[in-house]
From Swiss-Prot:
GO cellular component: cytosol
Cellular compartments annotated: Cytoplasm
Sequence positions that bind ATP: K205, G296, E327, G353, G354, D355, T356
Organism (species): Campylobacter jejuni subsp. jejuni serotype O:2 (strain ATCC 700819 / NCTC 11168)
UniProt subunit comment: Monomer.
Main localisation: cytoplasm
Highest taxon in the source lineage: Bacteria
PANTHER family, per the entry: PHOSPHOGLYCERATE KINASE (PTHR11406), PHOSPHOGLYCERATE KINASE 1, CHLOROPLASTIC-RELATED (PTHR11406:SF23)
Signal peptide stretch: none
Pathway: Carbohydrate degradation; glycolysis; pyruvate from D-glyceraldehyde 3-phosphate: step 2/5
Record GO biological process: gluconeogenesis; glycolytic process
Amino acids binding substrate: D22, F23, N24, R38, H61, L62, G63, R64, R119, R152
Protein name as it appears in the record: Phosphoglycerate kinase
Keyword Amino-acid biosynthesis applies: no
Amino acid sequence: MSDIISIKDIDLAKKKVFIRCDFNVPQDDFLNITDDRRIRSAIPTIRYCLDNGCSVILASHLGRPKEISSKYSLEPVAKRLARLLDKEIVMAKDVIGEDAKTKAMNLKAGEILLLENLRFEKGETKNDENLAKELASMVQVYINDAFGVCHRAHSSVEAITKFFDEKHKGAGFLLQKEIDFASNLIKHPARPFVAVVGGSKVSGKLQALTNLLPKVDKLIIGGGMAFTFLKALGYDIGNSLLEEELLEEANKILTKGKNLGVKIYLPVDVVAAPACSQDVPMKFVPAQEIPNGWMGLDIGPASVRLFKEVISDAQTIWWNGPMGVFEIDKFSKGSIKMSHYISEGHATSVVGGGDTADVVARAGDADEMTFISTGGGASLELIEGKELPGVKALRSKENE
């Protein structure tokens, strides 16, 4: 999308640069980072700035801290980043306090400073202009490379851009790549274009489904959200997840698909169990005959075969949402198999972030996918056709 100001359009030579990254990475109970994909994704932009003789200030949030706590510190991120870049990272003890400001002022060309968790400042999530002004005062150039938070109007994402003119703000390589992939997917997909949509709730994906229907050739609906559609068709779904208030909307989507000539595929069988737990009995049952007191927790083998057939001739596949409760091993098979089939084909495969990216990583298919988005919510909102606040803030005024 050429109307977004890119990092390449900016004269960075020897400037002090602020890069908003998305280092919101999962950690275990000992605060060890369990997946550093988001950190690795930021490296091309960081290296580009270093190659241009910049001094670099990095900023990110981590989790949703209610107060300042070592549990949410970016210290582990600094260590991992130092290892990945093979370079010392200066760590600030705060965000806009004396320590951060002193270290920012003394930062020399080729050095990197990582600020402490942005959400330790209450103003961050309120899009507070005073916080934004303090952050902006540390640098000459602002780069946003945090696609995962672009759908949020936060201080370090939106308000901060008001303090930089078009020659001094832009999108990093990761953000540009994310926007380009989503834009091409919606505007110029190679056909047949198949969307595979799962996850637990219809409510979270309703707008995306509505926006996708006129653009796709086929739509596969799996995961917990499929049961609202199956119920809308009059099937017995037992105790499976149901959003009763959305039955009418589900019917509308099915009707709209039919009117547009888009084939919509739902599970034909499911893995059912009396409870969502690893140590309960399970059985394969037809999707329309889930026994009372049982719930569907994954797609069954017949559904896996059907969905494999549906995507076999696809040229473009967009996948957002697991096919079952993949966190529990015995209900993860459908999601893992879908990951294998999508990655093995010749289609351009775009994976929406969040849980779907976790499934792909667990299946060992990450390297075979064309593109894995780093942002679940942001990716979904782009597909819904929404303008993301963080992206809008980087548009060139000439193109508005």
